[in-house]
């Protein structure tokens, strides 16, 4: 959608109490090599939500969805990760879950490596959220292990690491309780 529409949606969401805003990386611009346009859109959303939140005396977190299945290469995933972080993302997220290829361990590994490098260079911790195609306890454990190995145990908390699917909750609860559950 048009940037003006996105900004108005973000403004209204924060005015209504949203404490997090998710946006999708401007993929048309990014894939065309117009990295400045892609980064500028993130910066404008960041500025918008910060201004509204400041008037309310609070902070709002920005998650940028990279849609890694459409980026295809580790290099493109890394470039998008750094672009999003440098433009103001508090979290980077693999996907919307609405494309053919969503979260993959390979994409997660690349993104976590980028987060680690960004943290080493800036001291700012960026969160990671794999989303789409994660449906079993084994899937969740894979991503948990990647975050633990690449970023360290200090990232294993709700402020820096989350899953972007509710159906994995049933699988995890079933694994813990040793019975079939269907809460979500």
Each PLM stretch: what is its role?
Residues 1-128, 135-166, 174-184:
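Alpha/beta enzyme core
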Residues 170:
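Metal-centered catalytic cores of metalloenzymes
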């Amino acid at each position: 959608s048009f940037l003006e529409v996105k900004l108005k949606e973000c403004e209204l969401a924060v005015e209504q109490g949203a404490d997090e805003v998710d946006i999708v990386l401007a993929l048309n611009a990014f894939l065309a090599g117009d990295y400045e346009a892609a980064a500028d859109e993130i910066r404008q959303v960041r500025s918008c939500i910060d201004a509204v939140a400041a008037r309310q005396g609070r902070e709002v977190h920005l998650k940028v969805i990279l849609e890694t299945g459409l980026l295809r290469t580790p290099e493109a995933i890394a470039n998008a990760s750094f672009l999003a972080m440098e433009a103001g993302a508090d979290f980077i997220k693999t996907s919307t879950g609405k494309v053919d290829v969503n979260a993959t361990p390979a994409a997660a590994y690349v993104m976590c490596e980028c987060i680690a490098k960004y943290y080493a260079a800036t001291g700012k911790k960026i969160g990671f959220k794999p989303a789409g195609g994660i449906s079993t306890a084994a899937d969740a454990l894979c991503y948990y292990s990647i975050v633990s190995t690449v970023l360290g145990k200090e990232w294993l908390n709700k402020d820096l690491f989350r899953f972007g699917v509710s159906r994995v909750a049933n699988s995890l609860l079933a694994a813990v309780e040793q019975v079939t559950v269907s809460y979500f």
